[in-house]
């Protein structure tokens, strides 16, 4: 009986390995068929890929040829006339260029005057701080400053302060 069970076991193992081999071969055949289908699709789309590449390269060449213009959006869109259908570009006149230049110059002047005024106010503030630092400290101001900072003093500093106040009273 033991020999019979061993024999059956090897037969079952062979059957399993054979079925595994068959499934592997089936999947390989399916993959090969899928690859051939993909190749057919690729060959059909070669023209579209080439045309898209050429379109990209043409667009890139156009971008390289366009001059780089640094304009603000306001100046750029001022020259466009909007209609119901589309944007129509109209050439800007020399008068508008002159007015634009004048407006830009005034704007620059305003910016420079604003920055100058800002710097002046900062300098005035610094001068006031320096004046306050250099003022002679009166006894009342020193006393008030000490009382404000008493909490920050250590115990020994507080004792020394009290001794100094008592000695100054004598």
Curated annotation (Swiss-Prot):
An example molecular function term from Gene Ontology annotations: ATP hydrolysis activity
Region spans: Disordered: 1-67, 83-106
Keyword entries, A-Z: Glycoprotein, Host cytoplasm, Nucleotide-binding, RNA-binding
Chief location category: host cell
Example GO BP: viral genome replication
GO CC aspect terms: host cell cytoplasm
The record's account of how the chain is modified after translation: O-glycosylated.
Pfam family, one: GBR_NSP5
Subcellular location: Host cytoplasm
Biased composition regions of type Basic and acidic residues, renumbered to the chain: 17-38
Residue stretches of biased makeup (Polar residues): 45-57
InterPro entries named in the record: Rotavirus_A/C_NSP5 (IPR002512), Rotavirus_B_NSP5 (IPR020244)
Family, per entry: Belongs to the rotavirus NSP5 family.
Subunit and partners: Homodimer. Interacts with VP1. Interacts with VP2. Interacts with NSP2 and NSP6.
Protein's job: Plays an essential role in the viral genome replication. Participates, together with NSP2, in the formation of viral factories (viroplasms) which are large inclusions in the host cytoplasm where replication intermediates are assembled and viral RNA replication takes place. Orchestrates the recruitment of viroplasmic proteins such as capsid proteins to these factories.
The protein, known as: Non-structural protein 5
């Amino acid at each position: 009986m033991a020999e019979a069970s061993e024999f059956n076991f090897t037969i079952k193992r062979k059957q399993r390995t054979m079925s595994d081999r068959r499934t592997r071969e089936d999947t390989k055949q399916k993959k090969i068929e899928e690859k051939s289908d993909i190749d057919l699709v690729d060959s059909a789309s070669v023209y579209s890929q080439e045309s898209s590449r050429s379109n990209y390269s043409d667009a890139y060449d156009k971008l390289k040829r366009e001059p780089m213009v640094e304009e603000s959006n306001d100046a750029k869109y001022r020259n466009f006339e909007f209609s119901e259908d589309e944007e129509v570009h109209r050439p800007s006149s020399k008068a508008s260029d002159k007015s634009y230049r004048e407006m830009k110059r005034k704007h620059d002047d305003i910016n420079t005057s604003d920055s100058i005024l800002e710097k002046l106010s900062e300098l005035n503030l610094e001068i006031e701080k320096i004046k306050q630092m250099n003022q002679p400290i009166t006894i009342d101001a020193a006393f008030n400053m000490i009382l404000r900072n008493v909490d920050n003093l250590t115990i020994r500093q507080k004792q020394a302060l009290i001794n100094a106040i008592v000695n100054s009273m004598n």
